A protein has these predicted regions:
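Short, conserved charged micro-motifs
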Residues: 13-25, 86-90, 130-135, 179-180
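C-terminal edge-of-domain segments
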Residues: 159-181
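N-terminal low-complexity, intrinsically disordered segments
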Residues: 11-66
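Intrinsically disordered, low-complexity regulatory segments enriched in Ser/Thr/Pro
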Residues: 61-90
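Short glycine-rich, basic-tinged beta-strand/loop micro-motifs
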Residues: 5-6, 114-133
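Short glycine/proline-enriched loop/turn "hinge" motifs that connect secondary-structure elements
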Residues: 1, 58-59, 65-72, 111-115, ...
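Short, hydrophobic/π-rich interface segment
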Residues: 126-154
Length: 181
């Protein structure tokens, strides 16, 4: 399985705080400053007219950032488009770090907060990462390891959101809260 075409979506903690028009000037400012590490920021596209669509898209050479409205759950989504020379765990870690950097900037610039206890990981390549048990089994070990690295040892429960092979492989990541007595 090729892991470079993966994405992560952090859901907005308060969906009503997401006003799509506010993100256009923010993303243009990011392009002017080129402030996302390891990304050549290129353009902004407004898809706010599309119901439950990609919202506002920030295009970079290496991946796309979007204020996504999919499934009626607003959030920040980052899709990596280009491969790296990194191991699968390191590559996934880099994807999370890129999305986390963008989320921190948005929390500062747009005053929107993101839920880091529940999010999804999407394989954006049906050919090389089909939505089946084998691909999910191959993705789980590096994904779990990357999550532990990025979220400082936290455990996450990973489940497929759909068994429909026509859908992209989407993994729900839910932070496991330890019960201390």
């Amino acid at each position: 399985m090729q892991v470079h075409r993966l994405g992560v979506k952090f859901f907005a903690a308060d969906p009503s705080s997401v006003r799509l028009d506010a993100f256009i000037p923010i993303f243009h400012g990011w392009i002017q400053k080129q402030n996302l590490t390891g990304h050549l920021l290129i353009d902004v596209h407004d898809y706010s007219h599309t119901h439950q669509g990609p919202g506002i898209l920030l295009v970079a050479h290496e991946g796309n950032f979007s204020i996504d409205m999919g499934d009626g759950r607003p959030g920040l989504i980052y899709y990596r488009k280009t491969p790296t020379a990194l191991s699968p765990i390191e590559h996934l870690t880099a994807i999370f770090r890129s999305a986390l950097q963008a989320s921190r900037f948005l929390e500062r610039d747009a005053r929107v907060r993101f839920n880091m206890d529940e999010f999804i990981v999407i394989a954006n390549d049906r050919l090389h990462a089909p939505n089946n048990d084998q691909t999910f089994a191959e993705l789980q070990p590096p994904l779990s390891a990357a999550l532990k690295q990025v979220f400082e040892g936290a455990e996450f429960h990973l489940t497929r959101t759909s068994l429909d092979d026509k859908e992209r492989l989407t993994v729900s990541c839910m932070r496991v809260v330890s019960q201390r007595s």
